[in-house]
Amino acid sequence: MHEHAYRALNSSELMAYRDQKIKESDCKMRRIKNSATLSALQICTFLFLSLATAAAAEPKAPSSLTNIFAPESTPAKSIFNLSMFVFAITGIIFVVVSTLLIYAVVKFRGKAADSGREPAQVYGSTQIELAWTIIPVLIVVVLFLATARVIHAIQDAPKPATALEVTVIGHQFWWEFRYPKLGIVTANELHIPVSDPAHPTPTFLKLLSADTDHSFWVPQLGGKTDLIPNRVNEMWMDPHRPGLFLGQCAQYCGVQHAKMLLRVSVDKADDFDAWVSSQRQPTTDNEAVIAGKRVFETTACINCHTISGTAGNGHFGPDLTHLMSRRTIASGAAENTDEKLRLWIRNPDAIKPGSLMPAMQLSEPDVDALVRYLETLR
């Protein structure tokens, strides 16, 4: 009798324990459902805001940030449209899979009435297995064809006779721009003309590296393209409006990779012609700053830098012939002002830690004279 009571008591406890676990399971499933719903809402909200931001981007305003949502050239627009196409397909896949997952979790969750009953066993479905094989294959084929089409259109574009040719050389940690047909060499700030669709004047870039791997990337004007030692890569862009576009090195290249910035100034035809004319002007001797020129020619400056009309013919650092025509120094790390220029000469690491430019051990009078001289190089 006592044994039967003990067994009955154990059976009651087990039933109570099982009911408790089922309730806990139901609560857990509700939490999962709520969490999944919240996550889906957050993702949808983020995507909506991202697309709304892209749609609301003001195309006529000067660019101030690197922006992948406001393409301003044919290659960039092709890449953007492909990205949105892939995003739409993957978004649909995400919604379908998430919906089915949530439905299955909610519909077939464990209930108190299911206790002790084995769920229905399914041993395969030819239709479902064909569907989840054929549909993914078709999706991959569509994505492959769309991507191949864009790659072909960008990489195999013909070069018209009106195209501007620029050689881009990546250095640690600055950019060199050479215009072979114009006889111009500058640094960090690329000037190119706007391309009128009626009379296209695209810019074709030949990309080289002087030391290690770099990557040229101006998001609004084109995809990133690597600069690799002993290899020539090419890319092109045809900006549709004038303005300032920011870019940067997109391949880790050393300590100051993050500050290897670049600026692309897209000029109207007349403005670009004026810039070319000013860059072709030789430097002139100015008696008021002859002392600064002497400092440049008698110190280590000439080992790295070139200034037309002086003994300086170095190529390790940027060409300074028209230094003051640039808005920034140190590859965009600082504005090109008197104060920043003095600091850059005295202690480059204060502006760009890890820079390969050494601190010039100059007296204050020599720094003053050198800065006054450099400020005449326009």
Protein language model regions, located:
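N-terminal secretory/membrane targeting signals
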Residues: 6, 10, 14-17, 24, ...
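Alpha-helical transmembrane segments and their helix-start/interface "positive-inside/aromatic belt" motifs
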Residues: 30-43, 82-87, 129-134
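Hydrophobic alpha-helical membrane-insertion segments
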Residues: 41-52, 94, 135-141, 145
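Non-transmembrane, membrane-proximal soluble domains of secreted or membrane proteins
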Residues: 57-85, 105-315, 330-346, 351-353, ...
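Hydrophobic single transmembrane helices highlighted by the model
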Residues: 78-98
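Alpha-helical transmembrane segments
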Residues: 94-110
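Short, solvent-exposed mixed-charge patches
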Residues: 377-378
